[in-house]
């Protein structure tokens, strides 16, 4: 019989090797982009994962001081092309956000594939940032979080509240792929009593 930590490590390894559905790969890509933002000091709400089909075309809402980024993330085959209708969806949700929140966010379109010439023109004219970021299924996925009571807990991508947990570097929180690192730094798995 495996120890609890070895069992968790096996579950985590199996998750990373798993062949995910289209929506599962999309969530993985959104989580990777979230990781990149949080690593750089942003507070991120995973709007797309939490809201599902009702996400208003907003995969991530990212906040840093007075800056707001509304991110649309598209993990598509490198053989596909992003057309202007997807850029317009992001532009529309930005306008809706401005109307509701009286703040002027930056639109960011992140994808694994190319934009059509017209989509490139729209991105430029609408002042939307475009980033090409390849899906990396080995990005650090374990979240080491310190809760309000000071408890050091780590969350795995299949844990119930994983997407509700924020990582703030300035509080000593971090992402990793190593359960040993979590334990060594005094964190315990959220599911363990």
Name each model-derived stretch.
Residues 40, 44-65:
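Active-site metal-binding core of divalent-cation-utilizing nuclease and nuclease-like domains
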